[in-house]
């Protein structure tokens, strides 16, 4: 199995990471899925890290039966995009969802079938400057993916490894993808949400004992919920530091969106 065509649904920060990584991959047809005014705007190019990329722009029907569909939407947009995803996903399509939360795979599988879903997540720090998405490629942890059950070294996992090989897309394969997804969800809940409510930089977790308490309490509650669902987050690989200093004023994605 070789992946020759890739469609990206959602050309924000996450979609931009995929676009810039695959734009110059030999033998790959790359497109973004959009309609109406958004399609016209994307047709003018995607500005990423001070460079403009020009992936093809496809309607959902034009993207039908691509080899790989990357869903990179904001979570609130998923419900409204399910019909488009259903249109795009053909008999030979593999779908990965790089969305926050813990149930996007199940939601998408409800309309296209679970056999088309390959579980995944992404860890990326980015920000937007006017019409441009900016991120540090070297420090980006990238995509974590895996089959939810054996065989973990499936044909499609190997195909995606081959797709990402010799690109600047960082990735790793895991046998504990559900635990990894919940582990990222834990980070989002315990770090993103308190900061977003107060509008404070990430230095608040170092400077305020009250913020530390709130974060730890949320962590405990989320871990209790996960265990009740049979998710053992101790199986998730601990993220390695990138060595990049983060200023106390830095904002996680939730606060950036607000």
Question: What residues fall within each predicted segment?
Answer:
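Rossmann-like NAD(P)(H) cofactor-binding subdomain of soluble oxidoreductases
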Residues: 49-134
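Glycine-rich beta-alpha junction loops
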Residues: 36-37, 102, 121-126, 149, ...
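Internal alpha-helical scaffold of NAD(P)-dependent oxidoreductase catalytic cores
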Residues: 18, 87-88, 111-116, 133-239
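A structural signal for isolated positions on well-ordered beta-strands in alpha/beta enzyme cores
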Residues: 7, 29-31, 96, 118, ...
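NAD(P)+-binding Rossmann beta1-loop-alpha1 motif at the extreme N-terminus of oxidoreductases
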Residues: 1-54
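C-terminal active-site/capping subdomain that shapes the small-molecule cofactor and substrate pocket
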Residues: 230-258
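Nucleotide donor/acceptor-binding cores
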Residues: 3-4, 67, 141
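Generic preference for hydrophobic
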Residues: 32, 56-59, 145
């Amino acid at each position: 199995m070789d992946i020759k065509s890739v469609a990206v649904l959602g050309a924000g920060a996450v979609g931009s990471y995929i676009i810039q990584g695959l734009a110059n991959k030999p033998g790959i047809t790359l497109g973004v899925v959009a309609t109406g005014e958004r399609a016209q705007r994307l047709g003018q190019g995607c500005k990423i890290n001070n460079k403009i990329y020009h992936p093809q722009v496809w309607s959902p029907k034009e993207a039908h039966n691509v080899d790989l569909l990357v869903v990179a939407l904001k979570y609130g947009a998923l419900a409204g995009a399910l019909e488009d995803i259903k249109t795009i996903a053909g008999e030979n399509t593999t779908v990965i969802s790089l969305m926050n939360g813990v149930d996007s795979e199940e939601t998408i599988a409800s309309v296209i079938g679970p056999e088309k879903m390959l579980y995944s997540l992404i860890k990326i720090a980015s920000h937007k400057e006017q019409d441009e998405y900016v991120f540090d490629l070297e420090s980006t942890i990238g995509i974590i993916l895996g089959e939810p059950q054996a065989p973990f070294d499936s044909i499609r996992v190997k195909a995606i490894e081959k797709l990402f090989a010799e690109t600047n897309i960082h990735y790793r394969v895991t046998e504990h993808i559900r635990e990894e997804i919940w582990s990222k969800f834990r980070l989002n809940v315990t770090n993103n949400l308190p900061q977003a409510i107060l509008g404070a930089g990430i230095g608040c977790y170092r400077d305020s004992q009250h913020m530390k308490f709130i974060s730890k309490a949320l962590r405990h509650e989320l871990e209790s919920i996960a265990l009740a669902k049979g998710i053992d987050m101790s199986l998730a690989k601990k993220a390695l530091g990138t060595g990049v200093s983060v200023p106390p004023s830095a904002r996680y994605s939730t606060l950036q969106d607000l």
